[in-house]
Amino acid sequence: MQNAGIAFDSLEQLNAARQLACRLGLPLLTPPLNLGRPTITLVLSAQRLELHHPELGAPLFVDFVKGAMGYRRRQGEGRKQPLARAIGLKGNVCPDVLDATAGLGRDAFVLAMLGCPVRLIEQSPVIGALLEDGLARARKTPETAPIIAQMTLMQANAVDWMGTLNAQDFPDVVYLDPMYPERTKSALVKKEMRLLRILAGKDENAPLLLEVALECARQRVVVKRPRPGVFLAGVKPDFSIESKTTRFDIYLTH
């Protein structure tokens, strides 16, 4: 990735920052740092890994313990929420889920919280590093450790990875959350989503992703879309489940 680098806020983080830079193939930036420059910077501190970008204000990081995800965990949202219904959670049944577009891992965390084993695939090395850091920190916290134990992260191209699966390793459900179509007014696009677009790029392979997902899901493929959005690749689902802003399109495969 051009115009990006790895930084650290103390010498104690130097070795870890150097290893991360080597793994991601990014330059190691040495202090003093000017975080106002036009670059994407991963900053490693003793607390967490953060992503800084001058146009997007506050840094981006993954947190399953506090913040919005901590609130959802404490609220104990049940199986009647739209995501759970879309996945097919009923009774004591917890389907094996493959989240092929993991992103920051929020939906995968909710599904793991509800008892589903979840395999997460993230193609972007930078997003994957942020997610890996968030999982590692949550793994050390007693309240979230059992949930994180249900989650397995892989950094890979989802189409290629699913193509290598043997039939016995097929998931019950493949979950897809491709980038929503970009709105014409940039002010309406959340800064976080704008940054993810920069990192992940356009979902030009989304139609192929759906095609491969339909071939390997034992029970269903679930596609998350904006409520008024078009069907992914123009393929009509068997049915949909809606919330105020989101629509889950369900494609049955059995």
Curated annotation (Swiss-Prot):
Transmembrane segments: none annotated. Keywords: Cytoplasm, Methyltransferase, rRNA processing, S-adenosyl-L-methionine, Transferase. One of its GO terms (cellular component) is cytoplasm. It is an enzyme of class 2 (transferase). One of its GO terms (molecular function) is rRNA (guanine-N2-)-methyltransferase activity. S-adenosyl-L-methionine binds at R106, D107, D177. It catalyses: guanosine(1516) in 16S rRNA + S-adenosyl-L-methionine = N(2)-methylguanosine(1516) in 16S rRNA + S-adenosyl-L-homocysteine + H(+). It is found in: Cytoplasm. Its EC number is 2.1.1.242. It comes from the Bacteria. Belongs to the methyltransferase superfamily. RsmJ family. Specifically methylates the guanosine in position 1516 of 16S rRNA. This is Ribosomal RNA small subunit methyltransferase J. The gene is rsmJ.
